[in-house]
Amino acid sequence: MSQYQRLLLIINPLLRQSPALNHAAAVAKASGASLHIAALIPSLDILSLLEEGDRKVARASYLQEHRDWLKDQAEKMQGRGIEVTTEVAWADNMRQDILDHVTEMHPDLLIKQVQHEPVLKRAFFTPLDWRLLRHCPVPVYLVGAQSHALPQKVVAAVDVGDTEPSNSELNDRIILQASALALQCNAELHLLYACDIPAAFLADLGGGLTLSELTRELRKDLETSFLKLAARFGVPAECRHFITGHPVSALSEFAHEHQIDVIVMGRTQYGSLEKLLGSTTEHILYQVPCSILAV
């Protein structure tokens, strides 16, 4: 995986204490990549109550206030040797505007702060972060609230339970992206698989074996596959983690216990059920304090 060349950071300028600013600056500095910061502002309905002339003045004044602030942030980054450009604009369709920026820029990473949404709201509306995970053509780096600006511990979360060629290719991409991030940030690289063996699946296997015997056999096969994958990419033994449990809860517990800064995960193709319920990567956003890099 080559070194980063261009990074795109999307921010809401109303959230001026966003950790995403520091994360993007730190990764850009470490990698030598250029950084473009797009401050996209959702349309303010209250401005529609003003007369047209007053509305134009208010919109221009509002944008200028945020431009001045962002210019100050950019100058501080430039003082640290970071190549940075900025823009402030209204966003009538946030998802599409972000994707348009990605299409135009072709960045190596799209960086954005995790936007937490209440469970009830997620039941009726697909969160913006989920939509970006599903439709963004480049890796999406969603910054959590509690991790080092420059990652110190990166974990590649793979799935060795699916033997389809497409999943094997995804595992490779996950590890390569995690390796690239860890290398450029001088961070530790860990490899993890959360082994979750559903009883319903085992019950269908038959063969005269007991459930516990089937569990042991399947676990042994999965661990062998995991160790082969780790060996192929040269992951040291002390950085290999074969853990048991549901992926969301197991990853969350591991991230807390080991103070992980970034979890690198894959994005899958969605059927109707997955679109409704959300994937492991989408749900983990709300369970861990660290950042997620989805590839």
Place the predicted regions along the sequence by residue.
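Structural beta-alpha unit
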Residues: M1-Q3, R16, E75-L110, E117, ...
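Small/aliphatic-rich secondary-structure junction motif
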Residues: S2-R55, K153-G208, R216, R232-V235
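General small-molecule cofactor/ligand-binding pocket signal
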Residues: H36-A38, T85-A89, Y141, H190-L192, ...
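A short acidic, glycine-rich active-site loop
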Residues: R55-D68, T210-T224
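Short beta-strand elements of ligand-binding domains
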Residues: I111-V114, P139-A145, L293-V295
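Glycine-rich, Arg-bearing micro-motifs that act as flexible, cationic patches
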Residues: K112-R131, V262-Q287
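Short, structured interface segments
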Residues: P127-H148
